[in-house]
Swiss-Prot record:
Pfam families noted in UniProt: Ribosomal_S15 (PF00312)
Gene Ontology molecular function terms on file: rRNA binding; structural constituent of ribosome
The name this protein goes by in its record: Small ribosomal subunit protein uS15
SMART domains: Ribosomal_S15
Amino acid sequence: MSIAAERKAEVIKTNATKAGDTGSPEVQVAILSERINNLTSHFKTHVKDNHSRRGLLKLVSTRRSLLDYLKKRDEARYKALLEKHNIRR
C-alpha cells in the first residue's frame, strides 16, 4: 500500500536534513517505516493477503539495508533514527 502524497511530503519535511532532501537514509527509512506501519495495520484485517505480505517483507529488507548502511557510516545518526521511529534492532 502506498501512502498519500500529503503524508509523504509531511514525512519528508520532518525527516529532511536540509531543504529539498529526499534521498538521505533518514528520509528513506522514514518513508519505508510509514509504509510498513500502514501494511501492518492492513494485515490485522486481511490475514490471508499473502501477496501483500511478500511486499511487506521486501520493504522491511530494504529498510534493514539502509539502516545497515547508516550504521557503517554514522552510528550516532543510526541510533537517533532507531529511537525516533521506534525500530527494534
